[in-house]
UniProtKB/Swiss-Prot annotation:
Cross-referenced InterPro entries: Ribosomal_bL9, Ribosomal_bL9/RNase_H1_N, Ribosomal_bL9_bac/chp, Ribosomal_bL9_C, Ribosomal_bL9_C_sf, Ribosomal_bL9_N, Ribosomal_bL9_N_sf
Taxonomic lineage: Eukaryota, Viridiplantae, Streptophyta, Embryophyta, Tracheophyta
KW Transmembrane (keyword) present: no
Organism: Ipomoea trifida (Morning glory)
The protein's name: Large ribosomal subunit protein bL9c
UniProt gene name: RPL9
PROSITE patterns for this protein: RIBOSOMAL_L9
One matching Pfam family: Ribosomal_L9_C
Subcellular location: Plastid, Chloroplast
Length: 199
């Protein structure tokens, strides 16, 4: 059902005669003007713009990202977004499903963060990981200690799989103690000691 706005206008009869009209009782050949005022109202109707509340099923350039709720014009939705399968009308059932999905995602994020915190605690309580390398002159070692070396040691000692891409290790070419960082989660970083000694 369309919504309408109305504007009322007042209008008098013929603007050429003003507020006068020719009398029907005047004899032939003569014209008698009789003053007459008649007002009536004209209602102008205009359709208001229809807006649809939608949810995007995929990223739409210059409009929004997948899962975003927004208001768009009905024609844009009907002629572009709907045929392309990019959006759907928001219903109470859909809102309920979205809320359940958001709660599930939040619970999963919380669980992953807690696991990362527990793993960080394990790494930090271990103390240090010992690496042996063939010694050279003074404190120098042959080769270097890499992130992959640390990952292999963690797997051997703690039976934990760690991706070498999360390991940040300074360049190690001498014996001594170094600190490595493991980015286990965007909000959780574990710092571990790497103790390098010569054979």
């Amino acid at each position: 059902m369309a919504a309408y706005s109305a504007a009322a206008l007042s209008w008098s009869s013929s603007s050429l005669l003003g507020n006068y009209k020719l009398s029907k009782n005047a004899p032939l050949g003569t014209a008698k003007l009789v003053e007459r005022t008649s007002n009536f109202t004209i209602v102008c109707q205009k359709k208001t713009k229809k807006i649809r509340k939608i949810i995007l099923k995929e990223d739409v350039q210059e409009l929004g990202k997948k899962g975003q709720l927004m208001n768009v014009r009905a024609g844009y939705y009907r002629n572009y977004l709907l045929p392309m399968g990019m959006a759907q009308i928001v219903t109470p059932q859909l809102l309920k499903e979205m809320k359940i999905e958001e709660e599930r995602i939040e619970a999963e994020k919380k669980r992953v963060k807690e696991e990362a915190q527990q793993l960080a605690l394990i790494f930090e309580t271990v103390g240090g990981f010992k690496v042996k390398r063939k010694g050279g002159k003074g404190k120098q070692i042959f080769g270097s200690v890499t992130a992959q070396d640390l990952v292999d040691i963690i797997k051997a000692q703690l039976q934990r799989e760690v991706d070498k891409r999360i390991v940040s290790l300074p360049e190690i070419r001498e014996t001594g103690a170094y600190t490595a960082e493991l980015k286990l989660h965007p909000e959780v970083t574990a710092r571990v000691q790497v103790i390098v000694s010569a054979n």
